[in-house]
């Protein structure tokens, strides 16, 4: 009897290990439903390509600019879904690698990677940046920021400022870049990636880890402020690049306060105006004495989709106008402020519904296109091994400084020692902001030097772009895995009674 029980236990152990292995490697199992769906998607892609080719002509043929963008979007979407089967790896990692492969693999490079029109790529990346900024503004919880103002401020400004300074100071001797480019690189590295951190954090929160100490709320709130700060700092520093190269550094100095004040004021007024002309649904009571005096009816307002279209259109107008005026930083700050002001006019529920529409647009279209384009913009043949090695060293040094300052900034409150270590780990990943911003200096340099790819400003901007992509490739997968693995070991799990009280 005992022998049979032992055999049964061993069989169950083998079965559990097999099931665990299958869950760890889900790509080896493709269900008939998944295969059918993949074939339908492929058929749809081919049908769309045929229709577009008949309508457009040579632009949709291999080596054509529209064909290149079409293939990049499809391949990046597929790569993102593939990588998503291996949580906690973010889909954006696969999308970035897909674009990088399309540019640097012989055969694919000539047909797709090099065929992307630079001006079209810049415009599409700016549009994707607009989606990022609008989502950041809508998700900026002013009440939560005020409630957690001191710990959130320490965590949002301290680590980013320290990392930006460390990278800028070290980049001067390591890469021999001008100080303006060093400052831009510092703020490019400084931003956290909510797209990488928040999903892993929410999975831990659902299991009860860190809920009692308020770690998810603190990290989420501080991350939104950190993104705003890093984008504003990058934009202000980027405004000095071409102006300083042309000998007008003194004239660029006045742009920093002008961009900050002007962008914030313009964004606030635009957001309030947009909120006023796109009101939410509201109930109106008729006047006393009318036939319908005892019945209230609803006056329909704008739908979430229309609000999202209004807000995104206004944001793109601000961004492209700011680019023409060489005030990218002020325009980016203005979009964030406008989105936050409009969200306050609409109310929390309507702003969340508008954000849901933009989330669909981001996940299904803007994100795969942005990361594929930024990956396809990196040409490894134009980089030296010394530059890549120096970039890895700068990234490592910046992360060390950032982690230490984040650990110190998380102190002074109710967080335990291990929880402060987790916050420092969660403050490492980089992805979305780097992908959106890394190409802006290159766009400005190409415009300034008339498309000369061998110009000094263009070469420096290519180094900044390559290091931004390198930061994503290294920190996005490692950071997501580190947050997921360390969370269950460093955070305290709330008891059932604690979770119920937090939900109430």
Residue ranges and their predicted role:
Residues 59-73, 117-133, 180-193, 255-269, ...:
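Structural signature of hydrophobic alpha-helical transmembrane segments
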Residues 26-42, 88-91, 303-305:
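N-terminal membrane topogenic signal
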Residues 55-61, 83-90, 99-151, 278-393, ...:
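Membrane-interface junctions of multi-pass transporters
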Residues 141-147, 198-221, 225-261, 284:
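Alpha-helical transmembrane bundle and helix-membrane interface signal
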Residues 75-86, 107-112, 142-210, 273-276, ...:
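Transmembrane alpha-helices that form the ion-translocation and gating core
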Residues 43-53, 74-81, 99-104, 234-238, ...:
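Hydrophobic core segments of alpha-helical transmembrane domains in multi-pass membrane transport
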Residues 95-106, 154-168, 221-232, 304-320, ...:
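Small-residue-rich segments of transmembrane alpha-helices in multi-pass membrane proteins
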Residues 2-24, 288-293, 494-504:
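Non-transmembrane, juxtamembrane loop and terminal tail segments
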């Amino acid at each position: 009897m005992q022998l049979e029980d032992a055999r049964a236990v061993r069989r169950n152990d083998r079965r559990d290990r097999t099931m665990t292995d299958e869950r760890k490697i889900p790509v080896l199992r493709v269900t008939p439903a998944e295969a059918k769906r993949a074939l339908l998607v492929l058929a749809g892609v081919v049908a769309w390509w045929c229709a577009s080719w008949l309508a457009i002509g040579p632009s949709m043929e291999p080596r054509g600019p529209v064909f290149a963008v079409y293939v990049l979007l499809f391949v990046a979407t597929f790569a993102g879904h593939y990588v998503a089967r291996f949580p906690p790896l973010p889909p954006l990692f696969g999308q970035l690698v897909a674009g990088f492969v399309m540019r640097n693999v012989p055969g694919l490079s000539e047909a797709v990677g090099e065929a992307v029109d630079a001006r079209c790529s810049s415009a599409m990346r700016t549009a994707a940046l607009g989606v990022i900024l609008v989502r950041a503004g809508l998700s900026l919880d002013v009440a939560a920021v005020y409630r957690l103002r001191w710990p959130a401020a320490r965590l949002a400004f301290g680590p980013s400022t320290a990392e930006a300074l460390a990278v800028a100071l070290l980049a001067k001797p390591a890469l021999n870049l001008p100080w303006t480019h060093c400052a831009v690189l510092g703020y490019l590295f400084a931003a956290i990636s909510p797209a990488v951190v928040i999903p892993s954090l929410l999975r831990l929160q659902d299991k009860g880890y860190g809920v009692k100490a308020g770690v998810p709320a603190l990290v989420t709130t501080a991350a939104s402020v950190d993104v705003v700060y890093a984008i504003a700092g990058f934009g202000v520093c980027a405004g000095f690049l071409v102006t300083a190269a042309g000998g007008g550094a003194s004239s660029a100095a006045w742009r920093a306060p002008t961009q900050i004040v002007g962008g914030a004021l313009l964004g606030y007024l635009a957001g309030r105006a947009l909120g006023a002309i796109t009101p939410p649904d509201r109930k109106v009571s008729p006047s006393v004495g009318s036939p319908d005096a005892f019945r209230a009816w609803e006056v329909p307002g704008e739908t979430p989709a229309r609000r999202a279209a209004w807000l995104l259109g206004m944001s793109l107008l601000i961004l492209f106008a700011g680019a023409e005026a060489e005030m990218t930083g002020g325009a980016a700050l203005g979009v964030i402020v406008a989105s936050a002001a409009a969200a306050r006019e609409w109310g929390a529920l309507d702003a969340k519904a508008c954000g849901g529409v933009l989330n669909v647009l981001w996940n299904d279209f803007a994100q795969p296109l942005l990361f594929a384009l930024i990956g396809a913009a990196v040409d490894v043949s134009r980089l030296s091994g010394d530059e890549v090695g120096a970039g890895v060293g700068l990234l490592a040094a910046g992360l060390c400084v950032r982690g230490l300052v984040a650990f110190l900034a998380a102190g002074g409150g109710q967080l335990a020692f291990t929880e402060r270590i987790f916050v420092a780990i969660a403050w490492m990943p980089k992805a979305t902001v780097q992908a959106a911003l890394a190409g802006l200096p290159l766009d400005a340099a190409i415009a300034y030097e008339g498309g000369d790819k061998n110009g000094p400003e263009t070469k420096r901007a290519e180094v900044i772009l390559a290091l931004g992509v390198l930061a994503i490739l290294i920190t996005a997968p490692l950071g997501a895995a580190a947050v997921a693995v360390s969370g269950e070991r460093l955070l305290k799990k709330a008891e059932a009674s604690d979770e119920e009280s937090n939900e109430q």
